[in-house]
UniProtKB/Swiss-Prot annotation:
InterPro entries: G_ENGB_dom, GTP-bd, GTP-bd_ribosome_bio_YsxC, P-loop_NTPase
Similarity comment text for this entry: Belongs to the TRAFAC class TrmE-Era-EngA-EngB-Septin-like GTPase superfamily. EngB GTPase family.
Annotated residues for binding of GTP: 33-40, 60-64, 82-85, 152-155, 181-183
Keywords from the named record: Cell cycle, Cell division, GTP-binding, Magnesium, Metal-binding, Nucleotide-binding, Septation
Reported cofactor(s): Mg(2+)
Name of this protein: Probable GTP-binding protein EngB
Gene, per the UniProt record: engB
Residues that, per the record, bind Mg(2+): 40, 62
Length: 207
């Protein structure tokens, strides 16, 4: 059920600032993470659409929030928000600061935001920017906002390294969910899909 629902995802809109986003009354789940953490690959794998997270990333849109609608029979029942990867080395400092402010504003004030999915490459662990993001959202998490850390590219680690990375991240995530994920090995896909389904459909219970 969860994967079938995820496959309905389609591009909705893109916006450079929070106030350009449409006000929505369906649950919104935000995907965040540093550049090259595997965010686009994860979204495309979960939705079984090879180009979904790339389709709206035309030149000039790389610093936009991209929304994707989900729902069967054409009825939107949830939205994914793909936030730009942070930590671009090539982006001027003033642009980085501006974008961090936009992200922080979104994460703190977006009313229909129900969950955050943080992509993290377990070979590098949490970066300084990841930790800043966790601090920003902590008050909302304490109020009930769902939170998931996806350890992408898990196939790059041995089984022992995976177990260690999972244990460390569970401590750092402070009560959030943590899952190992590999698009290449199809690891963790069903697990993450089920969590997202449940968070978007709290009244329906388990998938």
């Amino acid at each position: 059920m969860a994967l079938g629902w995820l496959h309905t995802a389609k591009f909705l809109t893109t916006a450079p600032q929070l106030h350009f986003l449409p006000a929505l009354d369906v649950p919104e789940i935000a995907f965040v993470g540093r550049s090259n953490a595997g965010k686009s690959t994860c979204i495309n794998t979960l939705t079984q659409q090879k180009q979904l997270a790339f389709a709206s990333k035309k030149p000039g849109r790389t610093q936009h929030i991209n929304l994707f609608s989900l729902g069967k029979q054409g009825v939107t029942d949830a939205v994914f928000a793909d936030l730009p990867g942070y930590g671009y080395a090539a982006v001027p400092k003033q642009d980085k600061i501006r974008w961090q402010q936009v992200m922080a504003n979104y994460l703190v004030t977006r009313e229909n935001l129900k969950a955050i999915v943080l992509m993290c490459d377990p070979r590098h662990g949490l970066t300084e920017l990841d930790e800043i993001l966790l601090d920003i959202v902590r008050p909302r998490v304490e109020e009930g906002l769902k939170f998931l850390v996806v350890l992408t590219k898990a196939d790059k680690l041995t089984r022992t390294e995976q177990t260690k990375a999972l244990s460390i991240m569970k401590l750092q995530a402070g009560g959030g969910e943590v899952r190992l994920f590999s698009a290449t090995k199809r690891q963790g896909i069903d697990d993450v899909a089920t969590l997202l389904w449940q968070w978007a459909h709290p009244a329906d219970g388990a998938a």
